[in-house]
């Protein structure tokens, strides 16, 4: 079973479908997590034989290797098959691949039952590995009619405990305050262009089931920083509807806190919301409950470079092995 944790949009899927049709190939793998808390697959993976190495401009070193021993391949296949897979990145690619497979199968009656078009290339890694890196993606709101930072803070106080942070504080100071707040519940930092900043932590004395916007979130989502930000602040205070959030009408999604704060203080945008990274366990809990998180809730790092491995999608060529 494959579990998504984000909704997909029709525009990006249409773009990817055109790429599939033009290239008849999967040029960029998905990114999925399997469960292996006892690291039982490590010994099989260790049999891999090196094929190539390269470094990308972002400073990441990549190694490509091949597992060819039959017993190792079987151990990996069986181990992954026992696990529910969580999509970390590549929701649009995955759904597009499914649609493309149906399209080709319908148009090509002679297509092999194990044709290449029926398989999706994906990078799999152990979701229980403590070395797995997830970075936060922040929210930078802009073009807000009549917005004032003071009014945001005043309205937020009905839902959040408000703690003023040092004016003009560096990004490291703000993100450190966020890290310390994690133990108290969902929290974000709101920063203004003039240097003001506040730590907002969800109050424990309010009935979330009766909250105007948070009540529409399933309880499992109300435990996450990102869902509380989107429902409690972006929609509840700033009036950015879920549809506008999906369309990115008033939002940018920066990944580096220092760079985003610098742009804000240089006059770009109205307010910056800094986030903690969403723990993998929270993402899996939401997905297993059948829900999805807001867009760009996670940023798994590093990504596999496009073109490092290519899976052709020829319906007449069968992929070796069992279906």
Feature-to-residue mapping (PLM):
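Surface-exposed, charge/polar-rich loops and edge strands
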Residues: 1-323
């Amino acid at each position: 079973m494959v579990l998504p944790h984000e909704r997909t949009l029709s525009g990006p899927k249409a773009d990817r479908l055109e790429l599939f049709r033009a290239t008849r190939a999967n040029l960029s793998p998905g990114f999925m997590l399997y469960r292996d808390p006892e690291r039982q697959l490590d010994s099989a993976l260790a049999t891999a034989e090196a094929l190539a190495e390269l470094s990308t401009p972002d400073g990441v070193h990549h190694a490509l290797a091949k597992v060819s021993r039959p017993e190792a391949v079987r151990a990996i296949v069986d181990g992954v098959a026992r696990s529910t897979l969580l999509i970390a990145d590549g929701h649009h690619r995955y759904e597009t691949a499914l649609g493309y497979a149906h399209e080709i199968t319908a148009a090509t009656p002679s297509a092999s039952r194990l044709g290449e078009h029926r398989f999706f290339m994906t990078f799999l890694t152990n979701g229980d590995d403590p070395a797995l890196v997830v970075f936060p993606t922040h929210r930078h709101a802009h073009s807000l009619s009549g917005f004032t930072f003071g009014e945001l803070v005043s309205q937020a106080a009905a839902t959040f405990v408000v703690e003023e942070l040092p004016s003009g504080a560096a990004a490291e100071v703000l993100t450190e305050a966020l890290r310390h707040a994690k133990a108290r519940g969902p929290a974000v930092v709101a920063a203004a262009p003039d240097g003001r900043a506040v730590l907002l932590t969800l109050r424990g004395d309010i009935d979330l089931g009766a909250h105007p916007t948070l009540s529409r979130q399933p309880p499992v989502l109300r435990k996450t920083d990102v869902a509380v930000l989107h429902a409690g602040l972006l929609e509840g205070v700033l009036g950015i509807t879920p549809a506008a959030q999906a369309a990115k009408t008033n939002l940018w999604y920066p990944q580096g806190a220092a760079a985003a704060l610098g742009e804000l203080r240089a006059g770009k945008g109205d307010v910056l919301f800094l986030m903690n990274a969403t723990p993998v366990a929270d993402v899996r809990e939401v997905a297993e409950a059948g829900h999805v998180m807001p867009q760009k809730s996670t940023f798994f790092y590093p990504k596999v470079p496009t073109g490092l491995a290519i899976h052709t999608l020829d319906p007449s060529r069968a992929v070796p092995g069992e279906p």
